[in-house]
Amino acid sequence: MKLLYTDIQYNMIDILAGEAQLAAKAGKRVFYIAPNSLSFEKERAVLETLPERASFAITITRFEQMARYFVLNDIHQGETIDDNGLVMVFYRVLSSFSDQDLRVFGRLKQDAHFINQLVDLYKELKASNLTVLELNQLNSAEKQEDLIKIFTEVETILSAGHFDNQSKIAFFAQQIKFGHLDTALQDLTIVIDGFTRFSAEEENLIGLLHEKGVDIIIGTYISQKAYRSTFSNGNVYQASLDFIRGLAGKFQTKPEYVVSKQEALPAFTKLSQLFESCHDFSDSQLVLTDKDKEHVTIWDVINQKEEVEHVAKSIRRKLYEGHRYKDILVLLGDADAYKLQIGKIFDKYEIPYYFGKAESMSSHPLVHFVDSLERVKRYNFRAEDVMNLLKSGLYGKIRQNQLDKLEQYVIYADIKGKTKFFKDFTLDNHGQFDLKALNKLRAEVMSPLQELIKIQAQKGDSILQKLTNFLEAISLTNNFSKLIQGVSDTEQEKNEQVWKTFTVILEQFHTIFGQEKMKLADFLALLRSGMLAADYRTVPASVDVVTVKSYDLVEPHSNKFVFALGMTQSHFPKIVQNKSLISDEERAKINEATPDNRRFDIVTKENLKKNHFTALSLFNAATQELVLTLPQILNEAEDNTSSYLLELQDMGVPVVEKGGNRLAADPEDIGNYKALLSRVIELNRSAIDQELSKEEQTFWSVAVRYLRQKLAKEGLTIPEVNDKMQTKQVAAEVMAARFPIDQPLNLSSSALTTFYNNQYLYFLQYILGLQELETIHPDARNHGTYLHRVFELVMQDQSTDDFDSKLNRAIDITNHEDSFHLVYNEDEESRYALGILEDIARSTATVLKGDNPVQAESEEEAFELMLDQAVKIRGVIDRIDRLSDGSLGIVDYKSSKNTFDLQKFYNGLSPQLVTYIEALRSCKNLNDTDKIFGAMYLHMQEPKTDLANMKSIEKIPETVHKNLSYKGLFLEDEKAHLANGKYHLHDAVYSQKEVDLLLDYNKRLYRSAAKQIRKGNFLINPYSQDGKSVQGEQLKAITHFEADRHMPYARKLYQLPRKEKRQGFLALMQSKKEEEGNDL
């Protein structure tokens, strides 16, 4: 055995590749072993070092793969089982136990996270050369007993199913130990690179190979200064020191110091030595020169997007200088956080890259299909789960328009639960739906699912057969084939991997659960968890790509240019935590009680030395230039500067602040069309808030001119954010069809309010006729109609019964009317709403109870009112009352709070009550002596009082009574008849002259709106009260109206101070009237 070490400025790959080449020339078969995470990059690096760039005698691989070479054809091996298979085995085992059988884990036996922890522990036991029986140092005897029960039963099932119950490395070691491979091990050399520790399983294998006389060469990085030191704790080389010293002691071999022909730049050598001195408490006189600082830089950036943008620009610059993509390595502090930004921005800059991290299959349509199918069963046919299943593209032969109609009906009829999905649809909205076609589609879609779902607990093979029948009935394979037609080779390979994962899980289920009785829900849960946990196996599509991976997988001298992103304190260093079923304390006790080659790894104990060595490797990862970037905001939160970067700053490494300047005339902008186009669009969307130099003005004017020429050739235009809220005039033919010239224009008070809220809202509702999707569930409209009907019946009841009897009778009659019975007895939610409405009716009815001088003249009085033969106003008055003096009043029931506001009325937003007064005066043919005492709202509610604001309990009835009163506008002459407390008269009393003025101005509002509507030009002008915010309907999804950009288009309401409001607005109305008179 040879143990080699070298200073980090030298290249260990060159040294070990040379040793491998010498052994190959001597006729040896050489295995060059690298860690799992580095094997791909290591293979390329080693082969590039060899003069021939290839060798049949040297195999670059991993420990486990090397074991396969020797035991691949051994007849005693069992069938391989993957993690999904192990999950199934543990699930089967745990299902066989009762809660009482497992004293500690009994309540967790169906928990998916717990099962995954068991699988991890199972694999860790194999890697640690331990058995479950050696877990005798646990803090709880019951915990040990449970684990022994579980793992013993697992081993029994694996043996009975002829599965591998040991790893390939363990089987290889066993064969070596028994002498079955002595011949194969002759003339064998093993070179090991990139390790700072071995697992117990790997170390045991190395010991057995060493005993058989196999040449073993192990290399690592240690400085001579560190090797000679007697104290290594805290040293940046502690991980490799402990590693090499442990091997030297065990195998009685003295480590040798070696050097390579290649040596790193002085900048990186000095940086390493300064970093080492910081942690071994020694003095160093080394200083980074200005030339050294050109090779190592820290970038201080604003956020992740800016960070990746700057890196992408720098990569483009390297290409501009003649370098290749493969010369660049990008390292990430948090790979998950950067994956999306890297993908979007590198694509924009046309940078091909390989992301060295497993990609989940979870977004594939087949995984969506399995996920939705399981959720349909688990949640008993929720509408969203059923529709997601149908939308997967793999279910049946459903056309998109059929799917849209089905979804619309499911939403309308609130179809949920298998009972509703399996029965004919019967509810209709006045003929809106084609129930015959929908029920035909429902039967086609639901029949296969109905057959599958009704499966009772049975043997696994029987469930598989029924699933196969289901998949055939819905044409899954044909749909999958159509799905993958015409895709790229990369996508094709991904589709094949997903399908293989799907079939392998089913095969393993057949093997493990074939003769076991289980429920369909459990089977679908296993299938879903397996598919969601699966990852794609990805390899670079090309050699010339930028490699992107996590920084903790880096090695010294990895590439010419290295960018390390996200180097904040949260991720650099990374603190690994133990989340397994065996605590660190228990692991330490077990290690003390077992031999050296049988031990648990204690990752938390390794954190410090591993992080130091990783940081040292990172600082030496580049051979020409290293850039470490530090975002001020990472994952939408501020983070601190890494302690390692603070050390570098103290050593003199420069920190460059990278701002967000997108206007600079840089060469990389010229060399990349997509990035230039993207930046021009970005600039076009935002105001340029800085002055450009003459050089920058020239650059951008030439760049934009070039882009316009290129886009014109391709028939493209630069998209713009529309700062103009301009609409097209509706065609004259459309307006003539909608509003014939020879007929008056139909309006209502609600239509008028809509017009003055936002003219475009009126266009959508009354010209296009757009409506919100309805449902059978009662909404505010249904609630209002219900309460209207109750009060209508109460007021019509002329019997001698007391008021409460009349009210209860009215509620009972209303509840049994078909229109309400159908709506409010659909489900518990509807019945709950009905109970609330009954309470509201009883509370509000107290206004009508007792001594009341008012008599109901009529209910639901429809009217038509003509204005100048040009406008026809239609509406329905809820109730007309008559006072004892014969004057009439108007009552409008409201399910929400409403009052007559003079300011809103002036601005066209509250015309209802005044319109009703005009309609009553016109329809009843009232003369000048007939009076209308008022028009008012009655808020139907169950008043709630905040007791915290009550000064005394006696005030509660007064407050409640105040809330349950008529609010609107009242005639001053009738004030004496309205003083019974049921009418809110404060600031609501108007003289007859003032009422006439309101009526006249109301007509003006209608005429003005009708004139604008006839033109067919509808503005996007939601109203604003203060000119700073918008209160009107903005219709953002349609108009893209944004208050900060389009405020000039909003209609600012005319407002007056509170004290001047009444007289001021009346004066304005009078002046408008006089202006009209003068014009005439």
Curated annotation (Swiss-Prot):
Entry superkingdom: Bacteria
An example Gene Ontology biological process: double-strand break repair via homologous recombination
Pfam families the UniProt entry points to: ADDB_N, PDDEXK_1
GO MF annotation: an example: ATP binding
EC number(s) given by UniProt: 3.1.-.-
First-level EC class: hydrolase
Names of required cofactors: Mg(2+)
UniProt keyword Nucleotide-binding, yes or no: yes
Keywords associated with the record: ATP-binding, DNA damage, DNA repair, DNA-binding, Exonuclease, Helicase, Hydrolase, Nuclease, Nucleotide-binding
Similarity section: Belongs to the helicase family. AddB/RexB type 2 subfamily.
Subunit-structure text: Heterodimer of AddA and RexB.
Note: Despite having helicase-like domains, this subunit does not have helicase activity.
PANTHER family, per the entry: RECBCD ENZYME SUBUNIT RECC
Function: The heterodimer acts as both an ATP-dependent DNA helicase and an ATP-dependent, dual-direction single-stranded exonuclease. Recognizes the chi site generating a DNA molecule suitable for the initiation of homologous recombination. This subunit has 5' -> 3' nuclease activity but not helicase activity.
Protein name as annotated: ATP-dependent helicase/deoxyribonuclease subunit B
Lineage start: Bacteria, Bacillati, Bacillota, Bacilli, Lactobacillales
